[in-house]
């Protein structure tokens, strides 16, 4: 991912050697990295945290899913705020809330306070990604929307990869509580650069050049959308995308929440080795994000078809993950399971760049609201998936049965993808 970012920056040199759009993309990558570290760190500390606080698998699943209630709600609210008032202030506020909630997680004393900390974290992170999509829709050329979505989400998966060994190292020097405090303070690193680099309207940035402006989409002021959002009509267009994102999100929440415990409990690995195996699995996802963005844009340039570039790639990703998760259930060899999980994570993450590009394709002027509607499905999956997985695990004692849920939803998501129409732009109607 780092090599890809440097190549992109060199190809688009501007002031100080890096164009402003590249600087915006780099800061957004840093934001995705930090926010995913703060989101998934709880999975790595799960064995120690549950023992220390006396939590069952079901209680831990409830605490994890508590994040997703406000997260799902603020997909819609945050997307609207970014369309109406601009991403600059909205994203800075999100960052401050996330860092505060992460620090507070290190201070919890039981399941109640843990749930409260996760709820606050969900408020902060819920608006972040629709807001980032709104920012990308005005700061990135349309031909690079897939790449931009792929590379930013690749940064989030880099956070997934780094989190297990990073948390394990911090726990060796402090404790699981100290690791949350340290990460919360570290998370402030991207907020100041964001405020300094980003402007809601590229035309208002003093460092922007005429050449760079000509490469960007036709500008529309992000900090004061003159039209109210046509919620009902837009929601109808986005409903199939929301359903597909739910199916994808169910599986991702399994990877983010339960894979470290799967290696720790099912294969009896120690914390260090379960963290390393988990990082290897999530590394496959990081690669899939970048590859998905590059392939999606390449397909669009080659065919001119958004159906091919977005929908078909989503179907390939869903079916690939479906096949490799079946292999996970059918084998008990640690090495084969780890490889199949990595491949499943790779294919599931091929979905990310094209599906996050779809709201920008359908409704570029309402990209924040449209992507919020889409990722509402991901948030709902986050509410249900960790609890159902943990509950089935407690009820049956089998890891295979919860995995079957992901397998079925991946197949359903591939089928539902054929109802998406990224090639049909959303037609606006002016508010009276």
What are these regions (language model features)?
Residues 96-109, 316-332:
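C-terminal ends and interior cores of transmembrane alpha-helices
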Residues 97, 101-104, 112-120, 336-343:
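Paired small-residue
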Residues 42-43, 236-292, 352, 356, ...:
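Extracytoplasmic gate region of multi-pass secondary transporters
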Residues 54, 86, 107-113, 124, ...:
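Helix-breaking motifs and short loop linkers at transmembrane-helix boundaries and internal kinks
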Residues 40, 68-76, 126, 160-161, ...:
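Residue-level signature of mid-helix packing/kink "hotspots" within the transmembrane helices
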Residues 117-157:
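Cytoplasmic helix-loop-helix junction between adjacent transmembrane helices
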Residues 73-112:
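Conserved MFS/SLC helix-loop-helix module at the cytosolic interface between two early adjacent transmembrane helices
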